[in-house]
Amino acid sequence: DPITNEIGKTIIFAVSQNHARKLTEILNEFAEQLYPGKYNSDFAVQVTSQVGDAQQMTINFTNNNLSGKTTWLEGYKSCKTRVCVTVGMMTTGYDCPDLLNICMMRPIFSPADFVQIKGRGTRKNTFEYTFKNELNEEETQRHEKEVFKLFDFFANCEYFEEKFDYDEKLKLPKPKKGGGEGGGGGIDIDKYTSYRPDPLATMVEEQIGEYGMRIDRELFKKFEDRIIMD
């Protein structure tokens, strides 16, 4: 956050509800280690369909009152909770202008979903803090939002930049015949131990240039072609 220098507001997109719950636990443990007594397990919250009042939590995150106000600077309008961990919520139609970080901790195969998720960080915002100076006069500190960070743990950016076939013609699947009852659903795996190196230790930050990402150019081109045809 440009005003308080605490971690900016963040949305994490997880693979499943269990994954979201585990990420929330880990982040709150880290927050307590780094900032003892500052967040009291409110640093990260799980915002999924299994959590009561999840929809209201998304609204409170936008309105900067989720879990109360930030404790870093009295009078500054920002919420205490810094990270919302979700699966499918907070994508299409969700607006949070002061969002500074988006973490993709799940694979994304739909260009529309990728654009929607990435678009959560593109909203413009002015961070403001009004205070009284030594002369008891009001001053306002302002910072314009110029960038946001996209943390991609599943190479989604690479997939839509280099591997996705934008010219592929999709065919609708034919309906299946028969009256079977179907399968019994997936397997719920609660615990998983990974021995791979920490990706954060080797993560490379790449600045997106003025021409944007390929997925944006392709979608704009399709829109342009449709307008010309009409």
Report residues per predicted region.
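Conserved helicase/translocase motor-coupling segment
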Residues: 1-37
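Residues that mark the start of a beta-strand
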Residues: 9, 41-44
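Short, charged low-complexity intrinsically disordered segments located at boundaries
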Residues: 18-26, 56-59, 158-162, 182
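Conserved RecA-like P-loop NTPase helicase motor core
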Residues: 44-177
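Long, largely alpha-helical accessory region at the distal end of helicase-like NTP-driven motors
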Residues: 154-230
